[in-house]
Structures are given as C-alpha cells and as structure tokens.
Curated annotation (Swiss-Prot):
Heme b binds at residues 232, 380, 474. Binds 1 Ca(2+) ion per heterodimer. Tetramer of two light chains and two heavy chains. Glycans are attached at residues 52, 113, 327, 363, 700, 708. Ca(2+) binds at residues 234, 306, 308, 310, 312. GO terms for molecular function: heme binding; lactoperoxidase activity; metal ion binding; peroxidase activity. One of its GO terms (biological process) is eosinophil migration. This is Eosinophil peroxidase. The modification 3'-nitrotyrosine is found at residue 488. The gene is EPX. The active site is at 233 (proton acceptor). It comes from Homo sapiens (Human). The record marks 377 as: Transition state stabilizer. The lineage of its organism: Eukaryota, Metazoa, Chordata, Craniata, Vertebrata. The keyword Heme applies. Residues 18-139 form a propeptide.
Length: 715
C-alpha cells in the first residue's frame, strides 16, 4: 500500500501521543468523557488531513494533465460551501465513534453499539463538538417566496426538505454489519444465504450488449431523457466523501485499490472483456454520510439540494451560490451571464472561477472553463449545459418583461417573482408533460392527476432509494450527442459526437455553434429504447470519461455499487413495499420479468431475487403499457413525486401562491415556447417529449401559445 508522506506524519504523531486513551472508568460499561474528547480530537486530525491531501492531489492532477476519469467525476461530486461543512461534521462523528469502538472492543465479548455506552451528556458533547448538532425549531417563515435552501417550507419543521439534510428512508437500511459497511465489503460474507456478485460481473453479463442491438424509441425524443436528468438535478445530489485516502491508514485508494473507508473499489471479475488485469479496479468512493441522529448510528446519506421541484438547478440550493449567480451590477433582478462569449448574440452561462478547471482538460488549446449554474453538474455534458443556458435566459426574459410591466419593482422583487414563475414552469412541465410519458397517461392521471392541496404532515424529502431509481434515464441515452442545423439536418462535420468525447466539453458550446443545434438534436432525435437485452450503451458502460485515461468508468457498475454503499434493500424488499409479488424461484422471476433467460442470468449471479440490486432489478422489468418504466419504478416515482407536490407549501396550484388569473396564464406554458423565446429556433416540436422526425410533429413558433404576464401587472 502507498502510504502518503503528509498523512504518514499525522498518523505517526497520533501514535506517539496515544490518543483515545484514558483512565479506565470506575463503573463497568461507562466511558470517561476525557476518552471521548481524545477520540473527537483524533478524528478531526485524521479527517482534516485526508480532506486537505485529497484537495491538493486532485488540483495537482488537473494542473499537470494527469487526471483520471474518477478525478473528473469526483471534482463534480465534491461537496462545497455549506455542504462541505455538514459532511465534515458527519465524518468527524463517524470516525470518532469508530475510534472509540476500536478502543472499547477489547473490553467487550462481542459486537456492541458504541452509542449505547455513552451518556446523554456525552452524546450531546459528541454532537456539538463534531458540528452535527441541529436545531429544527419553529420560526417565522415567509408566505410569499421560497427560501433558496428550502428551509421554512414546512413551518412546524423548518428543515424538512431543506438542503444539506439526510435523505428519507422508506425502508430500513441494510448493511453488512448492521450499521455502515456495505454488502460486498467482505467477500466471504453472505446475504440471504448467497454471496453477492461483483457489480462489474453483473454489468458484463446483463447490461452489456452489441451495438447492432441498439433500438431507437419510436415514442420518445431525446429531450424526454434530457428533461429527466435536468429535473433529477433539481431534486437530489448525494456528494461523495471529500477524502480520496483512507481516514485511518493514509492510503491513496485510487492507486492501490485498497478497500478502506471511504474507499470501496469496484473489483474486476475473471475474463473481463475490457480490463485484463484482475488485480486492477475501478475506483469508487462512498457517498458522504449524514450526521447520526440521537443513538441511531446506521449510516445514511445527505441530499445537498432542496427536495422540492423549485428550479434549484437554476438558482442554487445555498445562499452563497445564489448570490454568485445573480447579476449584482444593476438592480434589474437578472442572473449573471458570460462576459467573454455570446451565442449568436444571446447570453451564455458565466464561467466558474475554479483555480484548476477540469473542463480545460477536454481541449487544452480551446481553454474554455466550466460553466457556473445552480447545480455543480451543469457542465457534465453540452446537452445538460444547453438546458441550464436556456433556463438562465428564460429567467432574464421574465425579469425584463416584469420590469416593463412594473417599473417601480426593485431588483429583489423582480428576481423573486421571476424565480417564482420559473419554479411553476418546471413543476408544470414535469407533472403535466413528462411524468405521464414516464408512468403512462392513465396511471399518471390516477395516481398524480388530482391536486388536493398542501398537507404539512406529508414528508417531501427525497428518498434514498429514489436517488438510485431515477437513474433509469441512463438506459435512454444514445451513444452520440446529435447537433442539427436550422433545417434539422446533420450537415456539420461534427454533428454526431460520441458521448465519451462530450463530457465536460464546454468548449463545444462556445466554439461549435452554441445551444441551438443541441436543442434541435434533442427534439428531433429519438431516445434509446430500454430493452432487457440492450440496457446501457458502451459509451457509458466502458468509456465514461475515457478521454483522459485508459480505464474508463462503468456507469452500470457505479450505480449498483452506489446502491450497496447506500445500504439499500434488495429487489424483493422494494416490491413488497410497493405491494407487488416477490418472486422466489426461477419460474416466479421468469413470470415477473416475462423472460426466462434473463431470470436465469439473475439467479446464476445473485442466487435469490432478494439480493438483486435495486437499480438493475427495476430497469429489467417489462415496461408498463404506454410507460417507460415497469411496475416497481412506477410505484417509487409516484410515491416520490406525490410527496414533492403535496408536501410543498409553495406548489403552484396551492391557493394563495398565485392568483387565479396567474394560474390560468401559467397553464399555457410549454418547454417548446421557452425554446422559441430564448433561441434562434423558429420551428419546434409541438409535443416535445414524444419522438418526432422533422417535419412531422413540428410547427412554427407562432403556433405555440405565449405566457401572458399581464396578470402580474401591479401585484
């Protein structure tokens, strides 16, 4: 193992000082408070050292051009600002408890819960010293506008649904040790009587397919997939641990494939079709933990975003970011725009001011940095950046029009009213246009169709399982980014860019035609159809971020490893939660999947349907009529989106949020109109999420209804 010099020094100091030592307590089972204080102090040293080394290491690799695919991914998965503070506090607490448990273990005859031996004052000390202490008390909350952080949406529980809080658990977590270690951590450890397969083996045997088997979806456009990613980035983001080295060993996990917290590498199975060295691995780092509450030490993860459908991907989920995104040079309520480049006279997103920018790696001669938007992942692909650019422009268009109607409004009023309208737009497009095509129109009408009003007892938080389940959209990605000219033709020499050459390529927007060709490609190109024998294209399964190193990542394997990292129960537990049958053998699983060969592959790998990882099990189910998901995903999505609506005090249909005239005006908005109003595109898809081959299904912008803002005059 490679012990890093800087961390080695810290560890040596800790050993010499003999931390976490103290006088044996007088009463059996008790812990001296001085021992607890020593463990907290040691934990802070270890965590801070790991954080600092990792940050310097990633920046050095980016600066030198030796960054790996995981470095690129990690850069955008790193917690920042207030999220980083919350994550650091959780790591302090988890590491301190681990150190204390290690010290007390020789005095115990078997496994024990270390928090059970701490007194209430000691638990409070641990919570306060680590920074985990939270106050969720009633406070005065505005009835007019949302907060940026989502705080105060629920007046009785102001933190419910706010950013930087723990994800909801709809089922108890399942960890190998009952507390934190993911299943698969110990190779010999069985789950429900069977050894778990390596996630890369599952990817190879079930997800992998030859390119000639790829089928385009005759019913859905690529814009359908893209909206799914855009709305997902409105709802959830579970950052990874900021450490890339083991907390207690100082080992660089990417260089050694060491399995030490927070490192959980993806091992390579025999006869892997791409990675020939079985001792190699795909680096993987655990999601940052949330702070344990009370005596519950079972690991959970945080959501860095607000849980509401509120356009936070445009405005941010932290106050500091929201202020950076605003144009502070005037009082017009506008969002900031790029000061160096334009897109045919229209605004582009501002550049982020990263000291060592990963987007520069994708084209060193272009020297175009990453964009700055409300979500840190905005530059992941040009398609996603195009959506962020579109909605930044729409905010500024709304603010400008509102100022024309209300010249006495100040900048904050213009900003807040435009943001409020934007939130309603995202809600309407998602629930009226997108979800019926996900769930099937009849089912969506039955389960999500009628809004009965706000209920303060509804928990709107994003569920841990949703963060994995909503990755169903990965199965709809085509292997190329398509860009079309004004006649919807692929006429340019670079009109079809492989996905593996598009990640973090902000330069392609600046120097290769802006966002219009990308949006046309999303409207006029069909999505990939998810089939049981063709799930995920190799651009994502074998070449993810390959442009900077030989070993690209495997998105399917990452998804399954993440579900184990998060302690998510297996396939049958979630079917039971949804009131669905739980197959026990080959015959029953074959009936559920309507595919005996696939059922046999699953059982050969997992031994029992109980163990099938939620992501792969859910996307393998046959699609419901008119839907793009099977029954399990439909259940999970209905549950989550119903909670996000009914538990939102600022939902657009709630009486008092908008006037009756304003609600009527908002009901006419569409994503097609937003494109018409903010680009040079004059012919758009009328039903934008459905597959339309130009010119069929396309109309002139003059035929798309406009949003009439007269209802906002003088309000």
């Amino acid at each position: 193992m490679h012990l890093l010099p800087a961390l080695a020094g810290v560890l040596a100091t800790l050993v010499l000082a003999q931390p976490c030592e103290g006088t044996d307590p007088a009463s059996p089972g008790a812990v001296e408070t001085s021992v607890l204080r020593d463990c907290i102090a040691e934990a802070k040293l270890l965590v801070d050292a790991a954080y600092n080394w990792t940050q310097k290491s990633i920046k050095q690799r980016l600066r030198s051009g030796s960054a790996s695919p995981m470095d690129l991914l990690s850069y955008f998965k790193q917690p920042v600002a207030a999220t980083r503070t919350v994550v650091r506090a959780a790591d302090y607490m988890h590491v301190a408890l681990g150190l204390l448990e290690e010290k007390l273990q020789p005095q115990r005859s078997g496994p024990f819960n270390v928090t059970d031996v701490l007194t209430e004052p000691q638990l409070r000390l641990l919570s306060q010293a680590s920074g985990c202490a939270l106050r969720d008390q009633a406070e005065r909350c505005s009835d007019k506008y949302r907060t940026i952080t989502g705080r105060c949406n629920n007046k009785r529980r102001p933190l419910l649904g706010a950013s930087n809080q723990a994800l909801a658990r709809w089922l108890p977590a399942e960890y190998e040790d009952g507390l934190s270690l993911p299943f698969g951590w110990t190779p010999s450890r069985r789950r429900n009587g069977f050894l778990l397969p390596l996630v890369r083996a599952v990817s190879n045997q079930i997800v992998r397919f030859p390119n000639e088997r790829l089928t385009s979806d005759r019913g859905r456009a690529l814009m359908f997939m893209q909206w799914g990613q855009f709305i997902d980035h409105d709802l959830d983001f579970s950052p990874e641990s900021p450490a890339r080295v083991a907390f207690t060993a100082g080992v660089d996990c990417e260089r050694t494939c060491a399995q030490l917290p927070p490192c959980f590498p993806i091992k390579i199975p025999p006869n892997d079709p791409r990675i020939k060295n079985q001792r190699d691995c795909i680096p993987f780092f655990r999601s940052a933990p949330s702070c344990p509450q009370n005596k519950n030490r079972v690991r959970n993860q945080i959501n860095a975003l607000t849980s509401f459908v509120d356009a936070s991907m445009v405005y941010g989920s932290e106050v500091s970011l929201s202020l950076r995104l605003r144009n502070r040079t005037n009082y017009l309520g506008l969002l900031a725009i790029n000061q160096r480049f334009q897109d045919n006279g229209r605004a582009l997103l501002p550049f982020d001011n990263l000291h060592d920018d990963p987007c520069l790696l994708t084209n060193r001669s272009a020297r175009i940095p990453c964009f700055l938007a409300g979500d840190t992942r905005s530059t992941e692909t040009p398609k996603l950046a195009a959506m962020h650019t579109l909605f930044m422009r729409e905010h500024n268009r709304l603010a400008t029009e509102l100022r024309r109607l209300n010249p006495r409004w100040n900048g904050d009023k213009l900003y807040n009213e435009a943001r409020k309208i934007m939130g309603a737009m995202v809600q309407i497009i998602t629930y009226r246009d997108f979800l019926p095509l996900v769930l099937g129109k009849a089912r969506a009408r039955r389960t999500l169709g009628h809004y009965r009003g706000y209920c303060s007892n509804v928990d709107p938080r994003v569920a841990n399982v949703f963060t994995l389940a909503f990755r169903f959209g990965h199965t709809m990605l085509q292997p190329f980014m398509f860009r079309l000219d004004s006649q919807y033709r692929a006429s340019a020499p670079n009109s079809h860019v492989p996905l593996s050459s598009a990640f973090f390529a902000s330069w392609r927007i600046v120097y290769e035609g802006g966002i219009d060709p990308i949006l046309r490609g999303l409207m006029a190109t069909p999505a990939k159809l998810n089939r049981q024998d063709a799930m995920l294209v190799d651009e994502l399964r074998d070449r993810l971020f390959r442009q900077v190193r030989r070993i690209g990542l495997d998105l399917a394997a990452l998804n399954m490893q993440r579900s184990r990292d998060h302690g998510l129960p297996g396939y049958n537990a979630w079917r039971r939660f949804c009131g669905l049958s739980q197959p026990r053998n080959l015959a029953q699983l074959s009936r559920v999947l309507k595919n005996q060969d696939l059922a046999r592959k699953f059982l050969n790998l997992y031994g029992t349907p109980d163990n099938i990882d939620i992501w792969i099990g859910a996307i393998a189910e046959p699609l419901l009529p008119g839907a793009r998901v099977g029954p399990l995903l439909a259940c999970l999505f209905e549950n989550q989106f119903r909670r996000a609506r009914d538990g939102d005090r600022f939902w657009w249909q709630k009486r008092g949020v908008f006037t009756k005239r304003q609600r009527k005006a908002l009901s006419r908005i569409s994503l097609s109109r937003i494109i018409c109003d903010n680009t040079g595109i004059t012919t758009v898809s009328r039903d934008i999420f459905r597959a339309n081959i130009y010119p069929r299904g396309f109309v002139n912008c003059s035929r798309i209804p406009r949003l009439n803002l007269s209802a906002w005059r003088g309000t």
